[in-house]
Amino acid sequence: MRLVLASNNAKKLKELGTLLAPAGVELVTQGSLGIAEAEEPHHTFIENALAKARHAAAASGLPAIADDSGLCVDALGGQPGVQSAHYATLDPADIDGLAREALRERQDAANNRRLLSALDGQANRRARFVCTLVAIRSADDPEPLVALGRWEGELLTGLRGSGGFGYDPLLSIPALDATVAQLDAETKNRHSHRALAAEQMVALMRSAWHLA
């Protein structure tokens, strides 16, 4: 079954393509079909993921899948949540002309600084990465498949590890005795919030859509 991935992220395409392969699905990015990215105006992961999936399905005429992910911190009432990617505001003068990768690195660093500042002196460091996956057969599908993965951890007071991106150097996973940034790709993909959500989605596709 061919599905449009409501993202233009090549790494996400590769990762989800591998994780969802047991369901017999083939993913293509919306960008490869000339589809622009959808707006994400909502306050919850599920609403944003559903909006993105519907947008991709309506524009392509194909089934679609979307994810919305982020970091939720208990002491901050679940924030940064859906604003995780843009938690900190960058000065336009500091990012003018930056290449996409350099811009992401600048944003990641600013996000981490703001998070550490917000948690300064806070004893409760519990947090989790959350991934919500939504798959639909058509834009008006009344029965979207919804899968949710949570990866529990604790936020450190400083960065540790050089791998990954975003908040990976700050979130320590006690069960693995390492931050996400210290894990190799195989371990991360086996335990991550996205892997957990994808495992659920494969089961849902098999039972509800009778795939693979």
Swiss-Prot record:
GO terms for biological process: nucleotide metabolic process; purine nucleoside triphosphate catabolic process. It catalyses: XTP + H2O = XMP + diphosphate + H(+); dITP + H2O = dIMP + diphosphate + H(+); ITP + H2O = IMP + diphosphate + H(+). It is an enzyme of class 3 (hydrolase). This is dITP/XTP pyrophosphatase. Substrate binds at residues 7-12, 69, 165-168, 188, 193-194. SUPFAM superfamilies: ITPase-like (SSF52972). Homodimer. Belongs to the HAM1 NTPase family. Binds 1 Mg(2+) ion per subunit. It holds the Pfam family Ham1p_like. The active site is at 68 (proton acceptor). Pyrophosphatase that catalyzes the hydrolysis of nucleoside triphosphates to their monophosphate derivatives, with a high preference for the non-canonical purine nucleotides XTP (xanthosine triphosphate), dITP (deoxyinosine triphosphate) and ITP. Seems to function as a house-cleaning enzyme that removes non-canonical purine nucleotides from the nucleotide pool, thus preventing their incorporation into DNA/RNA and avoiding chromosomal lesions. It comes from the Bacteria. InterPro entries: dITP/XTP_pyrophosphatase, ITPase-like_fam, RdgB/HAM1. The keyword Nucleus does not apply. It comes from Leptothrix cholodnii (strain ATCC 51168 / LMG 8142 / SP-6). One of its GO terms (cellular component) is cytosol. GO terms for molecular function: dITP diphosphatase activity; ITP diphosphatase activity; metal ion binding; nucleotide binding; ribonucleoside triphosphate phosphatase activity; XTP diphosphatase activity. Mg(2+) binds at residues 39, 68. Its cofactor is Mg(2+). PANTHER family: INOSINE TRIPHOSPHATE PYROPHOSPHATASE, INOSINE TRIPHOSPHATE PYROPHOSPHATASE/HAM1 PROTEIN.
